[in-house]
């Protein structure tokens, strides 16, 4: 009898230990999931992995006597009723030359909306050589109903692209943007709705 009681007690302790270990593992997985996104973003910005462009604060001091084609692609997600396009579909700067291009966005919805742009460069191995000095993608953009906004991008292509083994044969780059609704945006369903009396309610 005493042996059975001891075995039962030992089993309860073992079960509690397994439960605690499972909870610790579960919490650790959640923590790693949250940390993975900013760490991956940082890794992409530093290395140019997955076509992520670089952000710099000064212009290139070397300009090669060689040009490169840069084309532009503009998209919006289904949750953002904007018209978004590049003013010029392609430019042909010298490698190392700092130039400015412009994108236009128009809010077609009846309410003010805020968007944030994600971006990349293809071919992806060229992302590390595409340097942005100024870009609307660095901050969120808010447009009033019917408002059209011109948004500049100032960039240069690093001269090292011409000699790096993986990019020296690249002659055309494509800079792509996609606008998504900002996470801080108030859902349309929760915006005030006017009643027949003119009062607003949620």
Curated annotation (Swiss-Prot):
Gene Ontology molecular function: copper ion binding
Annotated signal peptide: none
Alphabetized SUPFAM superfamilies for the sequence: Ctag/Cox11
Topology feature Cytoplasmic, residues: 1-16
GO biological process: respiratory chain complex IV assembly
Keywords on record: Cell inner membrane, Cell membrane, Copper, Membrane, Signal-anchor, Transmembrane, Transmembrane helix
GO cellular component: plasma membrane
Stated role: Exerts its effect at some terminal stage of cytochrome c oxidase synthesis, probably by being involved in the insertion of the copper B into subunit I.
Identification of the protein by name: Cytochrome c oxidase assembly protein CtaG
Native organism: Agrobacterium fabrum (strain C58 / ATCC 33970) (Agrobacterium tumefaciens (strain C58))
Gene: ctaG
């Amino acid at each position: 009898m005493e042996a059975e009681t001891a075995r039962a007690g030992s089993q309860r302790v073992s079960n509690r230990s397994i439960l605690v270990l499972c909870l610790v593992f579960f919490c650790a997985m959640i923590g790693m999931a949250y940390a993975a996104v900013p760490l991956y973003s940082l890794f992409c910005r530093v290395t140019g992995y997955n076509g992520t462009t670089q952000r710099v604060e000064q212009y290139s001091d070397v300009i090669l006597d060689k040009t490169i084609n840069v084309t532009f692609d503009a998209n919006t997600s289904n949750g953002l009723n904007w018209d978004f396009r590049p003013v010029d579909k392609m430019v042909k700067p010298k490698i190392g030359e700092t130039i400015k291009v412009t994108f236009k966005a128009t809010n077609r919805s009846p309410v003010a909306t805020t968007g944030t742009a994600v971006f990349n460069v293809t071919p992806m191995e060229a992302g590390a050589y595409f340097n942005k000095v100024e870009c609307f993608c660095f901050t969120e953009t808010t447009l009033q109903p019917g408002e059209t906004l011109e948004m500049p991008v100032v960039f240069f292509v690093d001269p090292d692209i011409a000699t790096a083994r993986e990019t020296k044969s690249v002659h055309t780059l494509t800079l792509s943007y996609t606008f998504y609704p900002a996470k801080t945006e108030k859902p349309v369903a929760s915006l005030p709705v006017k009643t027949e009396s003119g009062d607003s309610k949620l």
